[in-house]
């Protein structure tokens, strides 16, 4: 019975309808509290399967932006995620999971909301708290749907046989914000419980208020100012609570940035407004993707350190915080430049957020081939590195020891990577070629050789983990048990700052943004704060946290290619304003009678 029910509830409908011929079963199930909460649990199914922390959601929310390029700046792979298809015909099926996931999730939420009067809760507070879970999740599904796809079909009631259609219509984003997203988040912020710092996956009041502020601010993208005051008000509720002890909403911001992503603070992270983690153990697991496909974010950001001979990818190292899985996200020159302060020093968040040194995990001796490839002097041949020794070091011009390290780049027994070897400040991009100092054989000084150093770059460590369930050691199948933070308190200050610019000309914006900067140990911003200042600050604070694609849309940076030409010119050459929306999966559009009309422009 349960397996049949779960299959029915998670049915992928090719008509955007959640029609289930066994709907009476759900009505019967909803007449008991346990049964109804089974329906509530089903609302989470698509979220945990496809969204925050799941495979490629990071790419949909952070890729194709100014902050990231594909590993080593290669433009022949993952083109839909990082290169706006790189000038080729767009892939129109890669969004299939999220398109189906939206309507699986919305369908489950609609069922739970519609049947909310059935279970015998003793108080309306208990009943509404459960309904609020479904309404919060429905808002999040629709929020992501409209920001990824634009106008989508708006469904707010369970679909019955009589309403099935193979010619669906699309509803514009603002209408969905007005009629579903914002009302659902208002309801959720009123009725969800406060929870504790240990509350995970289940949303709380602070999650609802945070997403209400986020959603209201996002409507500015559509030329609306109607909800900006509500965005600011919701943000201020959380800020006031945070600065007075968190007594009402349980909000908190760590005194130092370094505490936010400490693994010891992960499961009960106080700053996270909403977080999710998976369970896996010998007694079972809670992931529909399998017991080793849990939080996948730890797999995405590490540079290819295994390309150097003192490193290797092995099971033992995979279980350490340092890790060994080569990722797909490389920071752009623009992202790294954001951490250079006006006085020439580095924002402390750079070295907190990015790993720039790696130790050897095997014994290694430099041979002639490696010495020549990495532009070392002949004297380095035969030098040895022992396991645990410094193996790779990336240096920034602003580092205190930069000049000293720079002098050793050709003679050090570790691989020394100079920022200027990898990135070009003149061209705002990655150097694909390199001019050798120690010329030998095919390694020349005319800049025609492939740049081997571009494989090594600062690697975001916000999602690093040493907390794994080992599902199969021989196959290196390890499930990351750490939570992913979907939204945290620092973002609320930046939402308030941006809303204040739109509403009040930024009179209070500096106060909000400098709270975040002061906590990080960065120099305070002075003078008038602009939207670009906010966008830059969001890059520093929130890179790799599911925000950037939506940030660029909201602030108008996808209206034309000008912004990308100045921040990520390699990406700008492939940009078209149509690509601010993803393609609706042609797996779906092929099943309806108005597929061409339903599809987004440019696909």
Can you say where each PLM-predicted feature lies in the sequence?
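Flexible, polar/acidic helix-loop-strand segments at domain edges
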Residues: 330-485
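Conserved, well-structured interaction surfaces
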Residues: 32-38, 45-51, 73-149, 168-179, ...
């Amino acid at each position: 019975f349960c397996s049949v029910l779960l299959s029915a509830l998670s049915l992928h409908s090719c008509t955007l309808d959640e029609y289930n011929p066994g709907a009476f079963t759900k009505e019967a199930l909803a007449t008991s509290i346990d049964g109804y909460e089974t329906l509530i649990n089903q609302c989470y199914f698509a979220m945990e399967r496809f969204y925050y922390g799941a495979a490629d959601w990071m790419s949909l929310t952070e890729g194709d932006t100014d902050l990231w390029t594909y590993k080593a700046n290669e433009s022949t792979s993952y083109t839909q995620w990082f290169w706006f298809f790189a000038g080729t015909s767009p892939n129109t099926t890669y969004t299939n999971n999220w398109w189906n996931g939206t309507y699986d999730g919305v369908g489950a939420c609609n069922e739970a909301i519609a049947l909310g009067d059935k279970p015998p809760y003793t108080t309306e507070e208990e009943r509404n708290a459960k309904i609020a879970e479904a309404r919060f999740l429905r808002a999040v599904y629709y929020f992501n749907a409209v920001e990824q796809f634009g106008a989508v079909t708006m469904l707010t009631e369970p679909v019955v046989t009589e309403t099935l259609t193979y010619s669906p219509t699309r509803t514009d984003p603002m209408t969905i914000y007005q009629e579903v997203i914002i009302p659902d988040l208002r309801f959720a912020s009123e009725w969800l419980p406060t929870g504790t710092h240990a509350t995970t996956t289940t949303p709380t009041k602070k999650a609802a208020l945070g997403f209400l502020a986020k959603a209201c601010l996002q409507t500015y993208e559509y030329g609306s100012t109607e909800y900006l005051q509500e965005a600011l008000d919701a943000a201020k509720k959380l800020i006031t609570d945070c600065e007075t002890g968190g007594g009402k909403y349980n909000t908190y911001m760590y005194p130092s940035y370094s505490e936010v992503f400490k693994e010891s603070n992960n499961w009960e992270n106080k700053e996270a407004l909403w977080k999710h983690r998976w369970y896996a153990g010998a007694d079972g697991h809670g992931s529909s993707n399998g017991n080793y496909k849990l939080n996948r974010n730890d797999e995405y950001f590490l540079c290819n350190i295994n390309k150097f001979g003192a490193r290797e990818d092995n099971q033992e190292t995979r279980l350490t915080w340092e890790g060994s899985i080569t990722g797909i996200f490389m920071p752009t020159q623009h992202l790294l430049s954001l951490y250079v302060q006006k006085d020439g020093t580095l924002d402390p968040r750079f070295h907190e957020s990015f790993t720039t040194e790696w130790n050897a995990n095997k014994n290694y001796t430099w041979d002639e081939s490696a010495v020549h490839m990495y532009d070392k002097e002949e004297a380095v041949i035969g030098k040895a590195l022992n396991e645990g020794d410094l193996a790779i070091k990336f240096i920034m011009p602003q580092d205190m020891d930069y000049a000293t390290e720079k002098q050793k780049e050709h003679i050090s027994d570790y691989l020394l990577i100079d920022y200027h070897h990898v990135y070009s400040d003149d061209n705002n991009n990655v150097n694909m070629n390199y001019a050798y100092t120690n010329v030998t054989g095919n390694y020349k000084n005319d800049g025609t050789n492939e740049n081997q150093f571009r494989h090594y770059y600062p690697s975001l460590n916000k999602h690093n983990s040493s907390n794994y369930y080992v599902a199969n050691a021989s196959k290196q199948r390890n499930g990351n048990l750490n939570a992913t933070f979907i939204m945290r308190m620092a973002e609320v200050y930046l939402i308030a700052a941006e809303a204040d610019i739109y509403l009040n000309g930024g009179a209070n914006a500096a106060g909000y943004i400098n709270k975040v900067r002061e906590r990080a140990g960065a120099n305070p911003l002075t003078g008038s704060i602009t939207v670009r200042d906010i966008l830059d600050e969001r890059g520093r604070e929130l890179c790799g946290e599911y925000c950037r694609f939506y940030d660029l849309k909201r602030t108008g940076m996808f209206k034309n290619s000008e912004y990308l030409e100045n921040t990520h010119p390699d990406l700008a050459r492939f940009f078209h304003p149509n690509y601010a929306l993803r393609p609706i999966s042609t797996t779906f559009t092929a099943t309806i009678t108005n597929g061409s009309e339903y599809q987004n422009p440019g696909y």
